[in-house]
């Protein structure tokens, strides 16, 4: 039965899914990596597809920007469609001198400026961490593919313009800043499913380097390959 934001019927979404923020990136992945891809959602323009990758049934769906948006879709995917493995594939801004444009960052844990956890646990800070099994798989897959990859803490900010001081954040060893992973990791803990964030550095906050919107939408294929290989890894 469709949800308020996803029009798919039961069985039309695989139990393993990639979650790019940009719905057009979801379309790109479906068209370039999946076989026999079928669209299951276009509500609010948030495109979703199910197909096969190397013989394994997988789905891909956009989530929009920010923790509130990804939380809506992830909640419905988990509770209504039985998705068990969710991997965010998106972009991030580096706050570390050793993390460069187009490098991959795998978020081991995600600090956040969001109050998402405080709504459930107002008296203490709950750590948002990735599923270790998925993280370990993704790291070794990226390493085997020869892709420059960094593993460490990230920051999920509620603000795209403004937010915490990038220099101070970087001095704490944070690799990058993005806007969604902490929400996804929290839902992973809440519902006991596997979650992970794999990001491509699209901008360097310290140096001002950046990539184009077209490049962000249509390239960054290393991240997509690592995400798909991790989705199907046993």
From Swiss-Prot:
Residues the UniProt record annotates as site (Important for catalytic activity): 216
Pfam family, one: PNP_UDP_1
NCBIfam families reported for this sequence: deoD (TIGR00107), PRK05819.1 (NF004489)
GO terms classed as biological process: purine nucleoside catabolic process
Enzyme class (EC, first level): transferase
Reactions mediated catalytically: a purine D-ribonucleoside + phosphate = a purine nucleobase + alpha-D-ribose 1-phosphate; a purine 2'-deoxy-D-ribonucleoside + phosphate = a purine nucleobase + 2-deoxy-alpha-D-ribose 1-phosphate
Name the record gives this protein: Purine nucleoside phosphorylase DeoD-type
Active site: 203 (proton donor)
PANTHER family, alphabetized: FI09636P-RELATED, URIDINE PHOSPHORYLASE
Role this protein plays: Catalyzes the reversible phosphorolytic breakdown of the N-glycosidic bond in the beta-(deoxy)ribonucleoside molecules, with the formation of the corresponding free purine bases and pentose-1-phosphate.
EC number: 2.4.2.1
Residues that, per the record, bind a purine D-ribonucleoside: 5, 178-180, 202-203
Assembly and binders: Homohexamer; trimer of homodimers.
Keyword Glycosyltransferase: yes
Residue sites binding phosphate per the record: 21, 25, 44, 88-91
Family: Belongs to the PNP/UDP phosphorylase family.
One example GO MF annotation: purine-nucleoside phosphorylase activity
Keywords: Glycosyltransferase, Transferase
CC per GO annotation: cytosol
